[in-house]
């Protein structure tokens, strides 16, 4: 069976990126909660 993690930067950015989060009300709530919590990063690093 194929492993579940098949790295793809474009897919990662489109699914979990900042602009993807801003696009939906739920995504904006995610960013809001992460800001309140004081997270260093609001979204996963894509180009790392």
UniProtKB/Swiss-Prot annotation:
GO terms for cellular component: ribonucleoprotein complex; ribosome. Residues 29-42 have a biased composition (Basic residues). Keywords: Ribonucleoprotein, Ribosomal protein. Residues 26-48 are annotated as: Disordered. Gene3D superfamilies: 1.10.287.3980. Part of the 50S ribosomal subunit. Belongs to the bacterial ribosomal protein bL34 family. PANTHER family: LARGE RIBOSOMAL SUBUNIT PROTEIN BL34M, MITOCHONDRIAL RIBOSOMAL PROTEIN 34 FAMILY MEMBER. The open reading frame (ORF) for this protein is entirely within the ORF for the RNase P protein (RnaP). The two start codons are separated by four nucleotides. This is Large ribosomal subunit protein bL34. It comes from Thermus scotoductus. The gene is rpmH.
């Amino acid at each position: 069976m194929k492993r579940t993690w098949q790295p793809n930067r474009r897919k990662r950015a489109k699914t979990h990126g900042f602009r993807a989060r801003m696009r939906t009300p739920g995504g904006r709530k995610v960013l809001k909660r992460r800001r309140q919590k004081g997270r260093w990063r609001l979204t996963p690093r894509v180009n790392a």
